[in-house]
Design a protein with these regions (language model features):
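Cysteine-nucleophile amide-bond enzymes
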Residues: 2-247
Length: 247
């Protein structure tokens, strides 16, 4: 007959084990709250409206790095907010044109940062048709070449064209040619995706130019500096401490 050996734990050791477990749980919860608490609060604080445009920085994308650097902007991606089957979603060109839960889009961004731009009151009558136009593009592939003249489509182009069609030809932001941007540091990457020379005359709508559209107002942002990178650098210089002269 086999015997079951029972190890008696000293009360002091049991006490230490319990407190160590409690401490580990508290450390985990504190770390979780530190990392995710602010963005969770921002998510619940933001009150979505149909047609809001969400801008963010994508942290692990080569093309996002090119877009932000070439345009001197914190934004490399955008999508339009709408309610689908009772849930807030973001219609976006991300790998392909699709709809993604708002929470998933927010938590996907660099530092969980995002900015919300809203159509001004006199333009809100165009929102429903703009969203319908966006949905007509569902399943179209993402355009890594940022060309506005093919069957593929990129994030800011999706919203720009949908609004332009809804408004009867009104531009949402200013088109710029690639040659007007700071493309030189990213020439190798551009040539790789282009499979040829840099198309300097190609006109594109960038996330920055879309955000600067006169039809939009910035209404909410979290953990993202909405200023151009050059403005941040200028501010940094303002706070530079000069070395002492030794007097």
């Amino acid at each position: 007959m086999s015997k079951i050996l029972r190890t008696r734990i000293d009360p002091k050791e049991r006490h230490i084990l319990i407190w160590a477990t409690v401490a580990s749980v508290l450390i985990f919860l504190t770390s979780f709250a530190w990392i995710y608490g602010p963005v969770a609060i921002a998510y619940w604080t933001y009150q979505p409206q149909e047609g809001d445009i969400l801008f963010q920085s994508l942290p692990k994308s080569i093309l996002a790095k090119v877009m932000e650097g070439a345009t001197d902007s914190p934004y490399s991606h955008c999508g339009i907010v709408t309610k689908i089957d009772g849930k807030w979603m973001v219609c976006e060109a991300y790998q392909k044109v699709t709809s993604t839960p708002l929470s998933e889009v927010i938590f996907r961004g660099k530092n969980y940062g995002f900015a919300i731009y809203r159509f001004k009151p006199d333009k809100q009558t165009l929102i429903d048709q703009t969203i319908r136009n966006v949905k007509e593009q569902f399943d179209k592939p993402y355009d890594v070449r940022f060309s506005m003249n093919n069957d593929e489509i990129y994030a800011s182009e999706l919203i720009y064209k949908a609004y332009r069609q809804a408004s009867g030809g009104e531009s949402l932001g200013k088109l710029v040619s690639l040659g007007q941007l700071r493309w030189e540091p990213y020439e190798e990457t551009i040539r790789y995706f282009e499979r040829g020379p840099v198309p300097l005359s190609r006109e594109i709508i960038t996330p920055r130019n879309l955000a600067e559209a006169e039809q939009l107002d910035l209404v909410f942002f979290h953990r993202i500096d909405t200023r151009p990178a050059s403005a941040k650098m200028a501010d940094a210089k303002t706070f530079t401490i000069e070395p002492s002269s030794g007097d």
